[in-house]
């Protein structure tokens, strides 16, 4: 409908965060495909600077470059151009980062609270931390996202290594503990003697106990100091960030041609 009323040559874009261009444009003519792309704004749009412009092989590159400059100058966004691949760039790296933060916490036998204290504000991540973020998004929804990536990505992609099913997570979903929208998740609020108590899940036993505040002696972003700590927190931080960097760098030039975009 939009293509019927647009000015000839005008750019038409979708704000989808995951649906491939090849799917959205399957009913467009070859001429219309030249002017169609994806402009993925991250929420909340007012505060998030990142904007992904996803192109396809049919696009007029002059128009894509014009759109990029317009979004940077007029909208004040940090616009990057990427190819039509699963999850585009932001979600591909973001979901991998979440998964590696979770799997490394299991591997290193950290508690939910310890992992969230590190993979949180000290690493420039929202204060929810990794497990709190899982609860916020929905543990079951994240499971569906992982299945989608597993289906779409080639077997050689390192994403498969961090997307393997975790028995405890599977049990949570099956029991209705899907996060904040469910009966709880890695955290839950329990009432005892009329008082609300925040509880955290023990990753080894699967049992809940009162959540503990972990003091790692820093709440500000200080990644350099964090990864150089000679304790389990420093080792966890370095293991997570080094694997994220390694994976992200492997996506050039498949998703984008510039390392700066990553």
Task: List PLM regions with ranges.
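N-terminal glycine-rich phosphate-binding loop for ADP-containing cofactors
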Residues: 1-261
């Amino acid at each position: 409908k939009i293509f019927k009323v647009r000015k000839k040559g005008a750019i038409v874009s979708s704000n989808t965060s995951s649906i491939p261009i090849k799917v959205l444009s399957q009913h467009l003519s070859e001429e219309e495909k030249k002017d169609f792309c994806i402009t993925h704004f991250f929420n909340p749009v007012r505060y998030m600077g990142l904007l992904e412009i996803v192109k396809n092989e049919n696009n007029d590159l002059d128009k894509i470059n014009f759109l990029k400059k317009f979004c940077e100058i007029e909208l004040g966004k940090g616009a990057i151009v990427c190819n039509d691949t699963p999850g585009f760039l932001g979600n591909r790296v973001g979901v991998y980062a979440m998964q590696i933060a979770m799997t490394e916490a299991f591997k290193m036998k950290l508690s939910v609270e310890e992992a969230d204290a590190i993979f949180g504000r000290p690493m420039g991540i929202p204060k929810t931390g990794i497990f709190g973020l899982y609860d916020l998004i929905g543990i079951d929804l994240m499971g569906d996202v992982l299945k989608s990536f597993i289906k779409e990505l080639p077997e050689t992609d390192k994403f498969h290594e961090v997307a393997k099913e975790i028995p405890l997570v599977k049990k949570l979903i099956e029991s209705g503990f899907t996060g904040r929208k469910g009966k709880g998740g890695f955290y839950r609020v329990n009432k005892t003697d009329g008082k609300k108590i925040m509880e955290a899940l023990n990753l080894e036993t699967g049992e809940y106990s009162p959540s503990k505040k972990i003091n790692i002696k820093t709440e500000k972003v200080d990644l350099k100091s964090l990864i150089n700590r000679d304790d389990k927190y420093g080792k966890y931080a370095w293991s997570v960030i080094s694997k994220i960097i390694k994976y992200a760098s492997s996506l050039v030039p498949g998703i984008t041609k510039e390392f700066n975009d990553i």
